[in-house]
């Protein structure tokens, strides 16, 4: 059976910090995705999120309809506890991708990226 799933990536954060502003943008993705396919969601930062400790402070969240956001990926590519290996994160200092393989109906929701380098 083929079912069409809707994914939505959105603009997440404009964070003011002492070193200047970091603007995080996501391309809106609302194209239908067929169950079993793969989908990529991109996120871009106006500044590098590679911190002086060598870690990249970029998180990915999924907010399913009627639920609170769930952490999927932290430090750019580390899956949170209990998150399926169908979810993977990758990227560089400013450009990031969340890849979802073998999409399922339960993956429907709003996907957010978040930076943790600067705080308001």
From Swiss-Prot:
Record has RNA-binding as a keyword: no
Stretches for region Framework-1: 21-43
Disulfide bonds: 43-113
Annotated spans, Complementarity-determining-2: 75-81
Keyword DNA damage: no
A GO biological process held by the record: adaptive immune response
Region ranges (Framework-3): 82-113
Gene3D superfamilies: Immunoglobulins
GO cellular component, one term: immunoglobulin complex
InterPro entries named among the record's database cross-references: Ig-like_dom, Ig-like_dom_sf, Ig-like_fold, Ig_V-set, IgV_Light_Chain
Annotated segments matching region Complementarity-determining-1: 44-59
Chain spans, region Complementarity-determining-3: 114-120
Framework-2, as annotated region: 60-74
Signal sequence segment: 1-20
Keywords: Adaptive immunity, Disulfide bond, Immunity, Immunoglobulin, Signal
PANTHER family cross-referenced by the UniProt entry: IMMUNOGLOBULIN LIGHT CHAIN
Protein name: Immunoglobulin kappa variable 2-112
Lineage of origin: Eukaryota, Metazoa, Chordata, Craniata, Vertebrata
Gene label: Igkv2-112
